[in-house]
A protein has these predicted regions:
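Acidic, metal-coordinating catalytic segment for phosphate/diphosphate chemistry
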Residues: 1-16, 87
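A cytosolic small-molecule/anion-sensing beta-strand core signal
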Residues: 21, 29
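A conserved beta-turn-beta hairpin within the catalytic core of GNAT-like acetyltransferases
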Residues: 34-37
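The catalytic Nudix box helix
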Residues: 41-74, 97
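Active-site-adjacent beta-strand/loop module that shapes the phosphate/pyrophosphate-binding cleft
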Residues: 78-105
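NUDIX/MutT-family hydrolases
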Residues: 96, 107-139
Length: 147
């Protein structure tokens, strides 16, 4: 059974991974709606039978070519995108995790048009959503606390 992303019958569960390496976070430019063309955190939809962490690892490999280790849960939030008539076009519940690179080189792959590594003080130049900015800054703080 295929789940409809547009005009879903119920909220869809997504996962994301904030990958930090060498004091920089990995950003992706979305290649498909919603937020097509905008910079964001890599991630996507959880598949049936997958744990959150398995989903994060799969999505990061698909979108960026990186094999990652999931370090710690960051936060959960929801994104609701209404259409022009006020109907819910997209509704996601997203769990984001702090991740570390195990292997690979970051590259744009599935559903991604570009990748970039950004220091915390450089985030503003990528015009991230307020939620993505908050999550990434929280990930940097967690990374520093881990030493």
């Amino acid at each position: 059974m295929t789940v409809r992303r547009e005009y879903p019958e119920k909220p869809l569960v997504g996962v994301g991974g904030v990958v930090i390496a060498d004091g920089r976070a990995l950003l992706i430019r979305r290649g498909s709606p919603p937020l097509e063309g905008e910079w964001s955190i890599p991630g996507g939809m959880l598949e049936l039978g997958e744990t959150f962490e398995e989903g994060v690892r799969r999505e990061l490999a698909e979108e960026t070519g990186l094999e990652v280790r999931v370090v710690e849960f960051i936060e959960v939030f929801e994104r609701i995108f209404p259409d022009q008539d006020g109907r819910t076009k997209y509704h996601f519940v997203i769990l984001d995790y702090l991740c570390a690179v195990e292997s690979g080189e970051a590259r744009a792959a599935s559903d991604v048009s570009d990748v970039a590594w950004a220091r915390e003080e450089e985030l503003a130049r990528y015009a991230l959503t307020p939620t993505a900015t908050r999550v990434i800054k929280r990930a940097f703080a967690m990374w520093r606390a881990l030493g």
